Amino acid sequence: MAGYSRTPLARKLGIKPGHAVAVLGLVPSTFEPRLELPEGVKVSHQLRPQPYDVIILFVDKLAELERRMSPVLARLHPDGGLWIAWPKKAARKPTDITEDVVRRIGLAGGLVDNKVAAIDDVWAGLRLVVRVENREAVAYRAEPPAPKRKPRPRTKSGAGAAAHRALSRPR
């Protein structure tokens, strides 16, 4: 790719050793082979309960971006980065997404943009992060999810049991 940075794609996207990464949406087949991931990086193609250090979402329709934004944000680590990738105008792929649209949606979600990158000759990306002053407020995302509690067995005593027995007696 003439004219593109010689910086490895994983480094350009901020992927470091040991990171949890989610790659979602219309992922081009050439994307992952070009990543050259550092050691210990775990890649997922669907959102799981744990927080992700880097999420890369490929979209070509505004409706899809709006639909996926909330669940993706809920899984982003407070210090992590969310890359939204859309087709460049030069790619001549139909899309209703632009850099300005992505930025406005990010700002509405409490994020700020801090990096733009050419992912390849078709896709451009904008990195969004949680505002520094808000990271403490969303720090709960970094905690592993609480284990699901088993329902307590029903008992014949306790609050409401006396009323239930009184109502069920024959008159």
Regions found by a protein language model. Name each.
Residues 86-91, 121:
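Short beta-alpha junction loops
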Residues 66-78:
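A short glycine-rich, Lys/Arg-flanked "PGG" loop and its adjoining helix->strand segment in the class I
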Residues 13-27:
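Conserved class I S-adenosyl-L-methionine
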Residues 28-34, 92-94:
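Short, charged/polar "capping" segments at the starts of alpha-helices
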Residues 41-52:
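Short acidic low-complexity segments
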Residues 96-117:
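Conserved Class I S-adenosyl-L-methionine
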Residues 9, 131-171:
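Flexible, glycine-/basic-rich loop-and-beta segments that form/coincide
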Residues 76-88:
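Conserved beta-strand signature within the Rossmann-like core of class I S-adenosyl-L-methionine
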